[in-house]
């Protein structure tokens, strides 16, 4: 898998595009947690487009921006970096940290158990 890395501002913009499906610069500005100038948002979108993560299409007098790379692919790349940097390459240690989170509901834990059971069935 090609490593995908987003600096914080670009990650926030990508998160908005993943959530909304598509957005104009104004839509992204409105969805941001912190107010940002129109030109700053436009610059972030243009940078993401140059990197091949976003594309745009005309939409009236504006442009609609779309994520080209999916959240799952970007998330997999980010998790691989976290696993290597923080958990010394151990998926088991990373998983143990995740399931020790007391904020996980019983339903979430049950779904995780089901995912593990399916994955175990796939192994020869």
Q: What is each of the regions a protein language model found here?
A:
Residues 1-14, 122:
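Short alpha-helical segments that sit at the start of domains
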Residues 17-21, 98:
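Short helix-to-turn junction characteristic of helix-turn-helix DNA-binding domains
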Residues 22-32:
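Short acidic, hydrophobic short linear motifs in intrinsically disordered regions
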Residues 42-46:
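Short, hydrophobic-biased segments on the C-terminal half of alpha helices
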Residues 52:
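Glycine-centered, phosphate/nucleic-acid-interacting loop/turn motifs that mediate DNA/RNA or nucleotide
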Residues 55-56:
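Short beta-strand "wing" residues that participate in macromolecule-binding interfaces
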Residues 76-121:
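Amphipathic alpha-helical dimerization/coiled-coil segments
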């Amino acid at each position: 898998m090609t490593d995908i890395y987003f600096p914080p501002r670009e990650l926030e913009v990508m998160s908005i595009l993943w959530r909304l499906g598509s957005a104009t610069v104004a839509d992204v500005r409105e969805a941001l947690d912190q107010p940002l100038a129109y030109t700053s948002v436009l610059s972030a979108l243009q940078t993401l487009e140059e990197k091949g993560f976003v594309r745009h299409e005309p939409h009236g007098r504006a442009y609609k921006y779309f994520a080209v790379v999916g959240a799952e692919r970007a998330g997999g790349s980010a998790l691989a970096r976290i696993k290597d940097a923080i958990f010394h390459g151990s998926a088991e240690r990373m998983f143990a940290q995740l399931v020790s989170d007391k904020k996980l509901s019983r339903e979430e834990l049950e779904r995780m158990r089901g995912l593990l059971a399916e994955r175990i069935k796939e192994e020869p």
